[in-house]
Curated annotation (Swiss-Prot):
It catalyses: S-adenosyl-L-homocysteine + H2O = S-(5-deoxy-D-ribos-5-yl)-L-homocysteine + adenine; S-methyl-5'-thioadenosine + H2O = 5-(methylsulfanyl)-D-ribose + adenine; 5'-deoxyadenosine + H2O = 5-deoxy-D-ribose + adenine. The lineage of its organism: Bacteria, Pseudomonadati, Pseudomonadota, Gammaproteobacteria, Enterobacterales. One of its GO terms (molecular function) is methylthioadenosine nucleosidase activity. SUPFAM superfamilies: Purine and uridine phosphorylases. This is 5'-methylthioadenosine/S-adenosylhomocysteine nucleosidase. Keywords: Amino-acid biosynthesis, Hydrolase, Methionine biosynthesis. Homodimer. It comes from Proteus mirabilis (strain HI4320). Catalyzes the irreversible cleavage of the glycosidic bond in both 5'-methylthioadenosine (MTA) and S-adenosylhomocysteine (SAH/AdoHcy) to adenine and the corresponding thioribose, 5'-methylthioribose and S-ribosylhomocysteine, respectively. Also cleaves 5'-deoxyadenosine, a toxic by-product of radical S-adenosylmethionine (SAM) enzymes, into 5-deoxyribose and adenine. Thus, is required for in vivo function of the radical SAM enzymes biotin synthase and lipoic acid synthase, that are inhibited by 5'-deoxyadenosine accumulation. It comes from the Bacteria. Pfam families: PNP_UDP_1. GO terms for cellular component: cytosol. Pathway: Amino-acid biosynthesis; L-methionine biosynthesis via salvage pathway; S-methyl-5-thio-alpha-D-ribose 1-phosphate from S-methyl-5'-thioadenosine (hydrolase route): step 1/2. The keyword Hydrolase applies.
Amino acid sequence: MRVGVIGAMEQEVKLLREQIENCEIVSRGGCEIYTGKINGVDVALLKSGIGKVAAAIGTTLLLEHFRPDVVINTGSAGGLDAKLNVGDIVVSTEVRYHDADVTAFGYEPGQMAQCPPAFIADPKLVNIAQECIGSLKLNAVRGLICSGDAFINGAEPLARIRRTFPEVVAVEMESTAIGHVCHQFDTPFVVVRAISDVADKESHLSFDEFLSVAAQQSSLMVTTMLDKLKTETQF
């Protein structure tokens, strides 16, 4: 079992990289990929860069060159569910673009042309994440995560996303692109992120203050999931 783990920013991958045994670094296309073992599990950890294009480039490189069996997207997210606070966990059941609009041609809001309306997270990975949440006694919500090339900071964009996707639990800038590429490569994926801010008019201040908290919580989730994946033989 080889697990691909993807984070956008240095703060989101640093704690995991420090745990990799016999770490080797590959730099390609503006991305860095760190390979080795965490707790005996083969890992390829990608630092992709921020945004959908960077995430898609990095995920493609990861899948083409390192062939992980599954992919976990880690890092931070802005919470939209009322039950979420800073440090809580969100787990994707599906991911959608909040800034894609080809509805003029009969597609659903957020659906890219010639693609499914949503990219569905692997149910087995979702269940493993839920088991880890239970064992760690963390507060968590699972559901739809939406991505777009904008940091959501203000009432108008927040209202638009909630109006268009009333079931959304969190927003960020990479996971749907990652899910899109995994769909194209037929690779199981799940998004497991920690809340760094509650998406509102002050979210940029909260993000700066609490990113390290989110990084700690999301990294803890990944290492706990790796322990469970150690005994899995296939997906």
